[in-house]
């Protein structure tokens, strides 16, 4: 349960604070749940705010099954940003339906500058059957650069790392999707 999770996290957060260690809290399935369906922005915002109030350094908002659309990202951020400042939020997108780049762009428009990403878009979630990997690092970089952001990462180095990882894992190379929406 959500309450049980908070109960288990409390001593970990306190210990990290006592040790001066930054601690990121994660809110999974903030948009859609594989078991319960659509999550209301208010319900997700309640959990995000509660976690922020516990003193975590920042809160990562997860689209764990990759089903969120940009309008749903905007709807959630409209509620959350009345409670928690943008600088304390990170976004965690999966690219199951090819919308992660558009969702990065939607959250960037709200002042979000922290994104969980993975080289090659690998990953997934054992609790969300069928969910694709995390949004590819190169997709985030290209999307934010297209929106005018200065992202000081070497795309060639990312591509080399991606090819090495994919070669090692023996998986298929995934294309890096670009947003279909335009920067605002």
Task: Give the positions of each predicted feature.
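Catalytic cores and adjacent flexible loops of soluble metabolic enzymes
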Residues: 1-184
């Amino acid at each position: 349960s959500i309450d049980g999770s908070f109960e288990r996290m409390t001593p970990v957060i306190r210990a990290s604070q006592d040790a001066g260690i930054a601690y990121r809290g994660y809110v999974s399935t903030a948009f859609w749940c594989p078991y319960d369906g659509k999550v209301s922005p208010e319900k997700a915002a309640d959990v995000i705010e509660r976690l922020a109030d516990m003193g975590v350094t920042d809160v990562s908002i997860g689209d764990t099954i990759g089903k969120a659309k940009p309008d749903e990202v905007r709807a959630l951020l409209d509620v959350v940003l009345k409670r928690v400042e943008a600088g304390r939020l990170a976004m965690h997108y999966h690219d199951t339906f090819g919308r992660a780049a558009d969702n990065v762009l939607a959250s960037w428009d709200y002042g979000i500058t922290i994104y969980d990403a993975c080289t090659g878009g690998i990953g997934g979630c054992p609790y969300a059957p069928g969910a694709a990997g995390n949004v590819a690092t190169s997709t985030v970089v290209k999307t934010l650069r297209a929106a005018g952001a200065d992202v000081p990462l070497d795309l060639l180095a990312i591509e080399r790392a991606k090819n090495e990882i994919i070669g090692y894992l023996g998986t298929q190379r995934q294309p890096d999707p670009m947003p279909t929406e335009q920067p605002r």
